[in-house]
Amino acid sequence: MRKSVLLAIAGISLFATSLAAQIQGEYMETRSADVYTGQCFANGEVNLVGTEAILAWKVDRGSWDGVNLDGRTIAAALRANATLGDPYADPYPAKAVLMVDDQASPAQKKALVSLAKHYAGRLLENVVEVRSEPVMMETPQNHHQHGPARMMAGSMAAIQTRPLNDTDHLCGNEVTFYPPLVKLDHSVPAVALTDRYDGPGLGTEWTLHGKRSAFLGRFSEGNSTQQSAVSTQSAGGGD
């Protein structure tokens, strides 16, 4: 009897764990404005830069919309209507180009697009092009470190980061001025040694070096969140 109870408890525990993290993975982000900065530098960039961004997700393990996505990656390059994160301006409408793992099956590609849209919301409301590319993403094993990390999406986009250090304190009162553009479990700012987009669809290309404009982070979702997203889409309220 006691053994049966213990087995039942163990089963419930495993079930609860699977609900708590049905899908999880790594996230990278770069912006064309510094995200780790002081008020004076941020004021100098607002309305001038910060309308461009690259977002990337790599699934460590798990499923989305009932499709296993272990090891699959998707990246998005976008151009907004105003400095992203500025509370006094409207960045919408934004235009986006998606770069989907070329090793993914058609079902996986569809699920990756759904996952990215779930996280980025209105930023990916207007996708002008979806490309199949060899997307590679490497992040630190210790997720609380500030890099290094890198992401490449064929010849279209690239990110390379390094940790923040004392030389990155220019005015002495730097903070994480802008939060990440998506919901994350954990994130840290980093320096983007390279932030490049050479693809079509956005009406602009960029190559930036040495800006304090990157985030590394982790994401996860449970079954209840996925079920809610699917229900919303079925009702016509999702992307």
Regions found by a protein language model. Give the residues of each.
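Generic detector of low-complexity/intrinsically disordered segments
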Residues: A8-I9, A16, A21, A153
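Mature, soluble, non-transmembrane domains
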Residues: M99-F219
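Bacterial N-terminal signal peptides that target proteins for export
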Residues: M1-I9
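Short, basic, low-complexity termini and linkers enriched in Ser/Thr/Gly/Pro
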Residues: G11-A16, N223-D239
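Folded, disulfide-stabilized extracellular/luminal domains of secretory-pathway proteins
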Residues: A21, M28, V182-H186
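Generic "edge-of-domain/loop-turn" microfeature
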Residues: L6, C40, G62-W64, S105, ...
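Secreted/extracellular small peptides and ectodomain modules produced from precursors
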Residues: R31, G38, H169, A229-T232
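N-terminal Sec/ER secretory leader and immediately downstream segment
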Residues: Q22-V100
